[in-house]
């Protein structure tokens, strides 16, 4: 295949029903007598003369229309004819195994409601466009040219056609045209022989339209360089409209037919610019290296040249299948792609490329279900020795499944921006078994990488699958990755993925020798789950000159478990990236980690957690050996937690950690840590109601440094349980901000004042001051100096003033009550009245009253002639 800027769409194979061959007859071209058409026969060659003319339109009508192998059917029209309209009325399929041709630049229309088969030897020799259809009639503004209504004379009009009319169950169109050309090109590796599958071909800038019934393309080609190829059809009665731009409008509410491409079937509009492929069907199936190609051909194009788009509208499904299981990027399988500078495979199997100049077009897929399997591919790329932008890839569906397949937008070594990849699915998107969603700029390219945007109900990234937006060399920024799900986002390595380096990844990164910034990763969903060594990373690698990105998670429940990691690391002198999580609940367990740090001389990144509910940090052991290298793990392989630590060789300071939560719970090596080697430790700021740690399980809050100063730890909490400020110890839960050679940091723990009056009071030495709370009611003994006293021991049940009334829960006193009035006792401090009632206010305060209250029997002590101090236990 040639190296081009192109769009490739792989199509699945189909099994052709034998019914399509019914009613086919021996190759022949015969008029039906309804027009003035004549046919001259010379062996296998048929020359078509006369016909009915109206202005620039010429009309022919045939009873049979089939062309034998190595034969031809040539329309010998005047050069000033614009359109040739041909209908087949005899009730048999047209088998075209030879050449169809016409004079001048006339467009050729061929309709046969029974079906059309283009055999291996079928070719076109036209100066204009070709329209093949199994419609009943061609519509005009003033009538129709019908192949089924022969009772009325055919319409002969000077107007341009406006569309096609179909009856129920129109015939199918099959293309097996396998005409090929061998072209030689020369590039930096020498001369290469390229075999192009041409098939049915028109001149550059002209169009090919095939409208059925079902359309079957197998082991064949359709080529319209820089033109438009329309493929589609209806399976029920309806009308299709011709648009001025060469595209078609299909009716709503009418069932469409199917399109299949298999056995290297190729649909190609690549040229020096332009070229669109439009597919309008019910189901599109692609397999065995079927391809839709649009773009800039090798050694063609010019600055600013724009390749066309591939647009697929499938009301039910699009299925793209490769040949082999697994992924082998150098080979070409079934795919939808948009290339500038197509990589070529030499006869020895090695890969090379040739140049092109211009921008790749876009890929637009609209369907209910998109499935891409086993090396099926969507790709928009600019390859070496080419120059320009890659195009956008946009999929709108209800359900998307990508299994062992890539969706790619790439620029390799040249100048240009990478196109964005956007996947929208109302129900679900599943990327599984080593599939890749990639927006990447590689080599010395000057330009930005593309963005990856995913909007869906539920999203899963499973097995060895990856989403990557990165910049590898050159100048420019890496792209952003945005995932929004109305239900859930799930990432996990599968149990069958036993290889140590295989794990699901979402990566926005800046790699070596790149000048630019890494992208942002934003994931939003009610439930976000990372498990079994899943990785989300926004980083800047060694030798890159630029800032790492950040990771933001927005959800209700976020769980990071079984060795999964979110990191915003950098190996540059720039500050590390940030991690932000906004949720109601956050769990880090079984080796799950948040890591923001710096391996060079910059400062570590910051981590900010805004959690309205609980944060749980527990169990430092991941479920097996981690596939992550020491760059990510540092010395944290057997820990769970939140880390803004710098590497040992780093001279920067640790990052800051800010946490807001209702409760933070530590279990078994759950940690919060910011540390540095030569720089200062970072700050940890925690605002929570409670911090609870299971005792003696080495769960720590640390802001340390080796050579620099320790960081600061500020904690605002109602209470801390099981963890306290002290030196680090593997058997305890510690809060520590120390430095080995520098100054220790500062730890500030703020808990609320326990005084419920919210004011400072100097408390007396005794709990109850008897001289103020015990009334001297022993009147007979006052003159003798004998005073009353009350010592209360025990808990509850006894009021602190002896004249207070008891409730039902107090102790019982077995003595009669007196009805004698008790007069107030006069003291230097004023009159003292025995309490006779108790009132509880609405805000919970208890007030003792000098008068009896309802439903309470005030307890008035019996006056004794001799009182003494008594003790109540």
Q: Where are the predicted features?
A:
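Extracellular and secretory-pathway beta-repeat/beta-biased strand scaffolds
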Residues: 2-873
